[in-house]
């Protein structure tokens, strides 16, 4: 029984890789495969010096 489950799991992993399915695609099949990892993310980087200045001003 244990060997059968291991064999089926291994076959599933092999077939998933063979057909080009990633773990994310298996988890969310409706996701756009051409989109980046975070399509709603802000493209501008966070200005750490400005953030630190605001935090210092707020916290005293």
From Swiss-Prot:
Belongs to the MCD family. Mastoparan subfamily. The keyword Repeat applies. One of its GO terms (biological process) is defense response to fungus. It comes from Vespa bicolor. GO terms for molecular function: toxin activity. Its main location: secreted. Residues 24-45 form a propeptide. The keyword Secreted applies. Expressed by the venom gland. Keywords: Amidation, Antibiotic, Antimicrobial, Fungicide, G-protein coupled receptor impairing toxin, Immunity, Innate immunity, Mast cell degranulation, Membrane, Repeat, Secreted, Signal, Target cell membrane, Target membrane, Toxin. Antimicrobial peptide. Shows activity against both Gram-positive (S.aureus MIC=1.9-3.75 ug/ml) and -negative (E.coli MIC=15-60 ug/ml) bacteria, as well against fungi (C.albicans MIC=15 ug/ml). Also promotes moderate mast cell degranulation. Does not show hemolytic activity on rabbit and human erythrocytes. Its mast cell degranulation activity may be related to the activation of G-protein coupled receptors in mast cells as well as interaction with other proteins located in cell endosomal membranes in the mast cells. Residues 1-23 form the signal peptide. This is Mastoparan-VB1.
